[in-house]
Amino acid sequence: MKDPLDFSGKVVLVTGSSRGIGAEMIKVFDKRGAHCVVNYVADGQGQNKADAANVAKELNDPLVIDCDVTQPEQVESMMMEIGDKRGGLDILVNNSGIISDRTIKKMSTEEFESVVRVNLTGTFTVTQKAAAILRNGGRIVNLSSVSGQMGLFGQANYSSSKAAIIAFTKVSAREFARQNITVNAIAPGFIDIGMGKGVPEEAIQSFIKQIPLGRLGDVNEIVDAALFLSSPMASYVTGHVLNVNGGVYMG
């Protein structure tokens, strides 16, 4: 019997895959046989490009594409390149996201909108443009967050964007079903990687006290969730939010 987690021949795009959870995801998809697309957005210091290059060194013949997910023209160009060079797309993981915490009283409109623009509008734009090259039977996995389910202090922008991704996932699941494309979301809890790095130790211990399983999540537990939702094992799962949070939110 074929390994359901063998992605040989599948084309996989993980947005924001130059570092953090996205980088770990694309590495595992590669190890399981997928043709991988690494996405990053250029920054003034060239750090994101360098990070993407380092990830690409560990992969087998990847595409590496500079694309700002908030710019429709760039996203459309990325999809055209994937279509031209790989013939289509089988699995899309909308992972790109930013965080910028501040209380509502202190948060500027730009601080609110910039996070929503990347996290939510970026997910919409990539999904919309990917529709042109997504093959029948494909998979879309969106990264939400426990913050979007609970509403965390100081995260009006981030929580709002991640809550909206859940609604967007459900709408997308209905609309893409006619192409037998499933659309699901993962809602990570407090994970020991990526944007959580640099959090003060006392804050981390405070988080842990809220988690029934008594520990932070490991990035591989998020990767495993993405693998499952992208695999034939989840062929009858769509419009679902998979909580990977140690029990901090049960709903």
Model-derived features: positions:
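Active-site helix of classical SDR
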Residues: 127, 161, 169
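Conserved glycine-rich cofactor-binding loop
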Residues: 18-19
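Residue(s) in the substrate-gating loop at a strand-loop-helix junction
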Residues: 145
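Short C-terminal tail/terminal secondary-structure segment
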Residues: 2-3, 150, 209-210, 227, ...
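Alpha-helical segment proximal to the catalytic Tyr-Lys
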Residues: 132, 174-178, 235
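Substrate-binding pocket helix/loop in short-chain dehydrogenase/reductase
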Residues: 103-104, 111-113, 196, 207
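The beta1-alpha1 cofactor-binding region of Rossmann-like NAD(H)/NADP(H)-dependent oxidoreductases
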Residues: 66-77, 109, 221
